């Protein structure tokens, strides 16, 4: 891959962090979005922005710029609503696709509808190259090295987040969370998320957790076919995110209602956390793989979740530049492979927590 990547939604909060991180690595991009003036501001701000395209990526007629061999970095969520047409175009013409989604249904949809053609056309579709789900998937890859590939009984992730400051895109995604199905894995099948209270976690330094629907559950199902899998927020008195939202509802795919929510949201100015606030965003992440009677745990503690997302996207773009050799709909851990494991062990954002596995 020698041509610049397309950043979709380039004037969004996280997209601009990605653009800045790409500049640090001398990676060029073309800014894509619906608003000409906002795109012009991006091009003025970032010397590594080498072009702009005004397009609404929900409409097939406006995305014919995506051609064979291109790399599309999609930062325009909510992805359940805005990404399907773009993904279909990428897979059909032979363009690679990355996004930063934290939504399950668009990921499940790609596995069901695009996996075969993506493999045939030698395309990589990599969802959730972000703090949510990519870190968990990489930690799963690391834990798998210790399991001798034994059959997995359960795969669980637990987030303890010290701040509830969110980007505008994350806020909007949460408002639309129940317009699509949410999932856990139960009895080796994807099942609707109907109950958020979880079992008491074992071998972990907290007592309660609440299920929240992150894409890592879909990745775990597709990669490993465990008997059970779920993602969680830790429930502790000092956790600002103990409320965890209400996701235990059946999906109601009402496009008109979603569009109305999006429009109302856009009519209000939203500001994401500034650099100081991002740096102060502390977190802990625990990943548990239960094989027979042994529990393999990987855990990290760190800060700056949005910067982690930007760093992961750049890592993925660099990996594409080196020409991928595995194709299809891939989880972040599958796509990055050893490069991702090396990055886990050498980055400025987090450190491993030592825990005993039983």
Task: Locate each region found by the language model.
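N-terminal Rossmann NAD(P)H-binding glycine-rich loop of SDR-like oxidoreductase domains
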Residues: 5-25
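C-terminal catalytic/substrate-binding lobe primarily of soluble NAD(P)-dependent oxidoreductases
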Residues: 15, 145-358
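Short beta-strand element of Class I
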Residues: 28-30
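NAD(P)H-binding glycine-rich loop region in Rossmannoid oxidoreductase-like domains
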Residues: 37-38, 42-109
